[in-house]
Amino acid sequence: MPRKAASPEEAAGEPGPEEMEAGRPRPVLRSVNSREPSQVIFCNRSPRVVLPLWLNFDGEPQPYPILPPGTGRRIHSYRGHLWLFRDAGTHDGLLVNQTELFVPSLNVDGQPIFANITLPVYTLKERCLQVVRSLVKPENYRRLDIVRSLYEDLEDYPSVRKDIQRLSQEHLESQHLEEEP
């Protein structure tokens, strides 16, 4: 994962000259190459098999080895790296330390940072969709005697990319609100 040091534009999350030339700004959510190590322990405190995803320097999710329920793993990460956690089978979103994104901080006195992965409180509708998806084959969704909008909801599977887009939009909106007088 070696890479050149971040320019001031990159560090600020703004497009740098290379990205502007290519006509594509860098993604809002991406890891920063701080080169400051952080020892982290991922603790799967959920009943699900967890897939850790590191958002690389280009904002692309990179899968790491799965964590079975009730297990943990020491990870050598860096300050400013972004991590998401998903159910390995369904890609349902999970929480880490009560939030959707985990960003390691610097270790204090050599102690590792704990990333406690838990289930969120899903809405009743979300949980019902999860259960129906687990019991019914996708080709049989439209055979169910339910309202049409639920067919579409069932077919709208959890997606890491959609979540990254949503989190990016939320980040931009919160920055915009902070800038207003």
From Swiss-Prot:
- Main location (coarse class): cytoplasm
What GO annotations for molecular function exist for this entry?
A: protein-containing complex binding; ubiquitin-like ligase-substrate adaptor activity
Record membrane topology:
Peripheral membrane protein
Listed A to Z, the keywords are: Cell membrane, Cytoplasm, Endoplasmic reticulum, Membrane, Nucleus, Tumor suppressor, Ubl conjugation pathway
List the signal peptide residues: none
List cellular component terms (GO): cilium; Cul2-RING ubiquitin ligase complex; cytoplasm; endoplasmic reticulum; glutamatergic synapse; nucleolus; nucleoplasm; nucleus
Instruction: Give GO BP annotations, semicolon-separated.
Output: angiogenesis; blood vessel endothelial cell migration; camera-type eye morphogenesis; ciliary body morphogenesis; endothelial cell differentiation; extracellular matrix organization; eye pigmentation; homeostasis of number of retina cells
Q: Where is this region: Disordered?
A: 1-30
Domains: entry comment: The Elongin BC complex binding domain is also known as BC-box with the consensus [APST]-L-x(3)-C-x(3)-[AILV].
Q: Tell me what this protein is called.
A: von Hippel-Lindau disease tumor suppressor
Lineage of the source organism? Eukaryota, Metazoa, Chordata, Craniata, Vertebrata
